[in-house]
């Protein structure tokens, strides 16, 4: 397949830095929710979500580069990766009575369809799922690009959608609101970083240092989600650019955090909310932070990992099965 990226040469076999950054992103979000420090510190921790978005754009380009991947196969793999753990989380949250909304909101959340707009973005039954809505929107446009055999499709269409949102005004329909939201530009930033890494192999670590410096500056400015691509997304894109292909040592705990990042993100607010039913909100944040990390890691080991292994086995069985 024509990669349509205009890059070639060198593709590292393992992006260790990206893997570590996944864990860092999840830990930042958890620390923010456990402590709510307010001010610049809270906005800096918010950047964990922006880092996730940048990483997603990066990974989608790199993982499909030079491969003949059809749109349906791409969507299936993405849904298998995202939805099963999300459904398990929704079930747990509903049983514990921790979600927001009625049964119809829960049902729509199974398909990651937001029902209300909260803080400028579409919201679902379990609060952290708002980011997955953006992920799915990006995947949908990326899959269309694959159908057209051009991953460059997203570089044109997503910015155009955001421009339409600015020109015409934001929609009151939550899903349409998100489809034109500036946060989608962070996925494009990650995709552009992937082009850079694939083209020049090893961008300088100075990019990461510059990204941290810009984050310190951007965190000083309060603003809605519309300005986050500039104040938080751009710094995170530079961090990803600096660390994506860097040769980093194997650090077991960071690798474990990277492996567990999705479960950590989905599950972390459950132990935090349960703890707050016993202790004052935002108190003993170091304890609730550690508890949430532990629950996320346990969720990865005992739920996510076996589930992914089962899905792989089913795919293998389906691929090898022959009609009688």
Describe each PLM feature range:
Residues 2-20, 27-45, 61-73, 115-121, ...:
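Alpha-helical transmembrane segments in multi-pass integral membrane proteins
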Residues 20-21, 129, 133-134, 267:
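Short alpha-helix carrying the canonical HExxH Zn2+-binding catalytic motif
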Residues 52:
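Structured binding elements
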Residues 55, 61-65, 76, 82-140, ...:
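Membrane-interface helix-loop-helix regions
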Residues 78, 82, 86, 260-267:
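Loop-to-transmembrane-helix entry motif
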Residues 90, 94-98, 143, 293, ...:
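Membrane-embedded alpha-helical segments of multi-pass transporters/permeases
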């Amino acid at each position: 397949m024509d990669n349509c990226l205009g890059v070639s040469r060198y593709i590292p076999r393992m992006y260790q830095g990206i893997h570590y950054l996944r864990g860092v992103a999840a830990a930042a979000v958890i620390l923010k929710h456990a402590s709510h420090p307010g001010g610049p510190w809270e906005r800096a921790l918010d950047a964990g979500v922006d880092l996730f978005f940048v990483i997603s754009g990066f990974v989608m380009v790199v993982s499909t580069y030079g491969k003949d991947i059809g749109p349906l196969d791409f969507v299936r793999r993405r849904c298998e990766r995202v939805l099963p753990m999300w459904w398990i989380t929704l079930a747990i949250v509903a049983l514990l009575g921790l979600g927001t909304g009625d049964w119809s909101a829960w049902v729509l959340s199974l398909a990651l369809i937001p029902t209300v707009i909260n803080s400028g973005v579409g919201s679902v039954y379990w609060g952290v799922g708002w980011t997955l809505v953006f992920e799915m929107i990006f995947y949908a446009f990326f899959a269309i690009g694959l159908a057209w055999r051009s991953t460059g499709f997203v570089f044109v269409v997503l910015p155009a959608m955001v421009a339409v949102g600015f020109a015409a005004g934001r929609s009151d329909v939550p899903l349409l609101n998100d489809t034109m939201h500036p946060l989608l530009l962070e996925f494009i930033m990650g995709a552009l970083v992937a082009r850079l890494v694939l083209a020049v192999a090893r961008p300088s670590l100075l990019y990461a240092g510059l990204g941290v410096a810009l984050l310190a500056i951007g965190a000083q400015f309060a603003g809605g989600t519309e300005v986050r691509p500039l104040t938080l997304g751009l710094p995170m894109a530079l961090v990803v650019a600096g660390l994506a292909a860097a040769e980093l040592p194997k650090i077991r705990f960071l690798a474990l955090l990277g492996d567990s990042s999705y479960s950590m993100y989905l599950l972390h607010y459950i132990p935090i909310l349960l703890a707050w039913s016993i202790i004052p909100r935002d108190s003993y944040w170091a304890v609730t932070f550690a508890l949430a990390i532990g629950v996320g890691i346990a969720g990865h080991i005992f739920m996510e990992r076996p589930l992914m292994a089962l899905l792989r086995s089913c795919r293998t069985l389906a691929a090898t099965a022959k009609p009688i």
